[in-house]
Amino acid sequence: MNVQDRRRLLGPAAAKPMAFSNTTTHVPEKKSTDLTPKGNESEQELSLHTGFIENCNGSALVEARSLGHQTSLITAVYGPRSIRGSFTSQGTISIQLKNGLLEKYNTNELKEVSSFLMGIFNSVVNLSRYPKSGIDIFVYLTYDKDLTNNPQDDDSQSKMMSSQISSLIPHCITSITLALADAGIELVDMAGAGEANGTVVSFIKNGEEIVGFWKDDGDDEDLLECLDRCKEQYNRYRDLMISCLMNQET
């Protein structure tokens, strides 16, 4: 016995299935955040990205490439997170700078740079807004390579390594600033820095205030000349950070 399911709505016996023509779906093009500073600055190109790590509060990627060097930094921000124990009237910041797979820099150098960065961002982050809270910042040096293959002796190589780690500091500051902004952490101002022959100067407030000064061992130069060169780089990096954050919002 043929029993028909009366709950189903059946069409006519001669009905045919509908046929659809092949259509192309338009996929909107993603906006590029690759930014190149104007000027000579050793023909250095910068690529800035934010918000690409899901399991943290804020993240940033800074890729820098010049004719002789290439660097890639990833920064992850966790917090503000409550601190158990005694009450603190303002938040605390911890910054850890870690090597990538190459293990290029020793631990003491990285700790020294981390302490320098903490001094800067203790002045930049509005810690009074985060009582009894901690903000943990991790900077990973994922790629750092010298593109020149010139053979060097041990002394020259040691000086080059010292110069390279000082040239990393402005990119660390840029990456941390972008990651903090991505995490929604309140900042007094956007911090940036420039480097000139081993001297690093970090600025805020359009270059009117210095929040950090780093000087490698080496030949002493005219500090005013280094200051002007660092300030010029700071203004360039600051404009790039603002453009990056504006592009992420649109």
UniProtKB/Swiss-Prot annotation:
For this protein, the record's InterPro entries field holds: ExoRNase_PH_dom1, PNPase/RNase_PH_dom_sf, Ribosomal_Su5_D2-typ_SF, RNase_PH
What keywords sit in the KW lines? Cytoplasm, Exosome, Nucleus, RNA-binding, rRNA processing
Subcellular location field: Cytoplasm; Nucleus, Nucleolus
Q: Where is this region: Disordered?
A: 1-44
Q: Name one GO biological process term.
A: RNA processing
According to the UniProt entry, where is the signal peptide? none
Molecular function (Gene Ontology), one example: RNA binding
UniProt GO cellular component terms: cytoplasmic exosome (RNase complex); exosome (RNase complex); nuclear exosome (RNase complex); nucleolus; nucleus
- What binding partners and quaternary form does the record give? Component of the RNA exosome complex. Specifically part of the catalytically inactive RNA exosome core complex (Exo-9) may associate with the catalytic subunits RRP6 and DIS3 in cytoplasmic- and nuclear-specific RNA exosome complex forms. Exo-9 is formed by a hexameric base ring of RNase PH domain-containing subunits and a cap ring consisting of CSL4, RRP4 and RRP40.
Extra remark = Present with 7380 molecules/cell in log phase SD medium.
**Similarity remark:** Belongs to the RNase PH family.
Described purpose of this protein according to its UniProt entry: Non-catalytic component of the RNA exosome complex which has 3'->5' exoribonuclease activity and participates in a multitude of cellular RNA processing and degradation events. In the nucleus, the RNA exosome complex is involved in proper maturation of stable RNA species such as rRNA, snRNA and snoRNA, in the elimination of RNA processing by-products and non-coding 'pervasive' transcripts, such as antisense RNA species and cryptic unstable transcripts (CUTs), and of mRNAs with processing defects, thereby limiting or excluding their export to the cytoplasm.
> What is this protein's record name?
Exosome complex component MTR3
